[in-house]
C-alpha cells in the first residue's frame, strides 16, 4: 500500500462535488493501492452542507478513505495537497456580462492560486472545473509563480466525452471503440469538437458521418449540450462533470497512450500563442500531458481554432488586473 495522497475539493457542498467525492474516495484517481485524505473547502455559510457530505462519506466506509477535513480556510484546505479539484465558482447572474463573471470568479481563483503556491505539495496537480474554467485556471496559475505552469489544467474532458457519446449514438458503435477525437479551445459555445483524425474500429469517422451533420448538428450540439441538459433536467450537468473530472485527473496521474482532450497552458504548438489555457490533443506520460504533434491542420480547423484563441485572449484581457 502506498502512502496516502491529499486531495482538495472546493465547492464541497455542491452538486458536482457530491458525485465527485465518492469516486475519489473509492480510489479512482490514484488507484486501488493508494489511500486518500480529503480536504473539503467551502464558504462559511455552506460548511454545514460540507459536514453532511463528510458524514455520508464516512458512512460509506471506503477502505481507502483515511481522513476528511472540512474548512473555509484556503491555506488549511491546500496544505500538503497532491491534487486539487477547483469546483466551486460563482455562477452567472441574470443579465450579468461575461466580463463581470470573469472578474468575480477571478476574485475566487486568484487567492486559491496563491494558497496553492504557498502550501500545496511539490507534486500538486490542479484541475479547474468551475466555469469559466479556462480563464479561471489561468488566473489561479498566474497567482502561483512557484508551481510549474503545466500543473494547472482546465476541464475539457466533459466536452470530449460528450463528443464521443454523440458519435456513438450516430454510428451505433460503442463509446470505447472511438480513438483520436479531440476538442480544441475553450469550454464555451466556441469550442471545436474535431473528428478529422478520429477512428472507430479502424475506420475513419469522417467516412461514416455526413459532413453537413458534422458541421451543423454535431459541433453545435456538443458545444451546447450543457444548456440542453439544463432545459431537460432543470439543473446543470453534475454527475457527468464529476465523472469527466475523475477521468482527467486519473489519466493525468496514471497515464494514457490514447488521446484525451485536456485544457493546458499553450506552449506554442500548432501556432497557438502562449498565455492562454485551451483544449488540445494530448496523451499523458510520466505524470505530464504531452501535446500530440505533427497533425496537419486544414483551413476549416484553423478558423475554428483561431476563433477559440481570440475568445480566450479576450477573456485574458478582461482579467488582466488579476494575473
Curated annotation (Swiss-Prot):
GO terms classed as biological process: malate metabolic process; tricarboxylic acid cycle
Keywords tagged on the record: NAD, Oxidoreductase, Tricarboxylic acid cycle
Entries under Pfam families matching the protein: Ldh_1_C, Ldh_1_N
Classification via InterPro entries: L-lactate/malate_DH, Lactate/malate_DH_C, Lactate/malate_DH_N, Lactate_DH/Glyco_Ohase_4_C, Malate_DH_type2, NAD(P)-bd_dom_sf
Reactions listed under catalytic activity: (S)-malate + NAD(+) = oxaloacetate + NADH + H(+)
List of residues binding substrate: 92, 98, 131, 162
A single GO molecular function term of this UniProt record: L-malate dehydrogenase (NAD+) activity
EC number: 1.1.1.37
Active site positions, chain numbering: 187 (proton acceptor)
Residues that span the membrane, as ranges: none
Binding site for NAD(+): 11-17, 105, 112, 129-131
Family matches, as SUPFAM superfamilies: LDH C-terminal domain-like, NAD(P)-binding Rossmann-fold domains
PANTHER family: MALATE DEHYDROGENASE
HAMAP family found in the cross-reference section: Malate_dehydrog_2
Entry's family note: Belongs to the LDH/MDH superfamily. MDH type 2 family.
NCBIfam families documented for this protein: MalateDH-SF1, PRK05442.1
Protein task: Catalyzes the reversible oxidation of malate to oxaloacetate.
The protein's name: Malate dehydrogenase
Naturally occurring in which organism (per UniProt): Corynebacterium efficiens (strain DSM 44549 / YS-314 / AJ 12310 / JCM 11189 / NBRC 100395)
